[in-house]
């Protein structure tokens, strides 16, 4: 015959296993979302670097052609 403590422990263990499975699913969803965010951040970083390089090239060109004027 099974002891009441063993039965109670089995119920608790079952609840723990269920909760850990739910937690794992939530973490997997969060990791997928973070991966998508990181991909978008890489795209934003690339565009920002392109604009920075463009600004540097424009400044170089304006200085080289003596067309750089002080801001009004």
From Swiss-Prot:
Location of the protein in the cell: Nucleus; Cytoplasm, Cytoskeleton, Spindle; Chromosome, Centromere, Kinetochore
Keyword flag Transcription: no
Gene Ontology biological process terms, A to Z: attachment of spindle microtubules to kinetochore; cell division
Pfam families: DASH_Dad4 (PF08650)
Record bears the keyword Cell cycle: yes
Entry similarity comment: Belongs to the DASH complex DAD4 family.
Self-association and partners: Component of the DASH complex consisting of ASK1, DAD1, DAD2, DAD3, DAD4, DAM1, DUO1, HSK3, SPC19 and SPC34, with a stoichiometry of one copy of each subunit per complex. Multiple DASH complexes oligomerize to form a ring that encircles spindle microtubules and organizes the rod-like NDC80 complexes of the outer kinetochore. DASH complex oligomerization strengthens microtubule attachments. On cytoplasmic microtubules, DASH complexes appear to form patches instead of rings.
Protein name from the UniProt record: DASH complex subunit DAD4
Gene transcribed to yield this protein: DAD4
């Amino acid at each position: 015959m099974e002891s009441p403590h063993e039965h109670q422990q089995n119920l608790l263990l079952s609840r723990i296993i269920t909760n850990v499975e739910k937690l794992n699913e939530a973490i997997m969803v969060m990791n997928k979302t973070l991966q998508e965010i990181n991909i978008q951040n890489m795209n934003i970083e690339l565009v920002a670097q392109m604009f920075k390089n463009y600004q540097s090239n424009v400044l170089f060109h304006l200085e080289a052609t003596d067309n750089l004027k002080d801001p009004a």
